[in-house]
């Protein structure tokens, strides 16, 4: 794109340069800038009259149409002085784009910069530019409460539940969590007493920009009739006839979306586990599996409906 007229910003004024890494986790629907959501950062202070240059780098696998309220910015490209003016720029995956604008809004105030994909914005991919020495806004008699209302978007917690009913029992899992903290649960129950049951609960926090690491504390309940004294692969005895233990561990997402889980319980027993959900075998056929050093194995083959495609 090329502008019909020169779009140079004023010269001889201070320049504020910002580097924004567009980041996120596609599996958890968490989107951020520089690894932090809107509510996890302070407003960006700018001065009236200065030039603001933003270097945007998209490190995700999705495109992000980044939109700035209240200002047109220069989309810096090979046309130099004739770079076009825009208020939204679509950043392609693994691409870098430089934009710049002059902070010339006479009313000053607060201006939102965010991804224009709605759920990306609501999960935290945005920043607020605030002019220094802005006069009070008569439409916002309580500015702090108003700001908290904006921050509430990416502070929400969501509940997801899956349960598979089989001929001899059911297997399920749930998660109730937000951007960082998460409560997770898993269970396997049989319809007959001889099948027993097993349930786990975890409270943990996702660490890092990609959120691959999840350290946690939790509880484990196990009952299987007639299986007292079974040994795991580390030659440690497990009391599966009736057992309630606290656990401390960590989960890590590996390549191919495999999840490795390492934990130790209050009896000193160690368990290593590898699992993967929703492996696409065909357009409708899916596979999930789990195996661990307690000699527990599960494999689930199922079909997905058209709504999942």
Describe each region flagged by the PLM.
Residues 159-163, 183-185, 213-217, 258-262, ...:
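Transmembrane beta-strands of outer-membrane beta-barrel proteins
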Residues 23, 249-252:
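A structural motif
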Residues 179-181, 206-212, 253-257, 279-284:
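Outer-membrane beta-barrel channels and translocator barrels
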Residues 302-309:
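Conserved small/polar residues in nucleotide/adenosyl-binding loops
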Residues 24, 59, 165-167, 176-180, ...:
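A generic beta-sheet turn/junction motif
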Residues 162-171, 188-199, 209, 221-228, ...:
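Solvent-exposed loop/turn segments connecting transmembrane beta-strands
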Residues 1-159, 163, 169-171:
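Copper-binding active sites and cupredoxin-like electron-transfer domains
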Residues 8, 42-44, 89, 151-153, ...:
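Outer-membrane beta-barrel proteins
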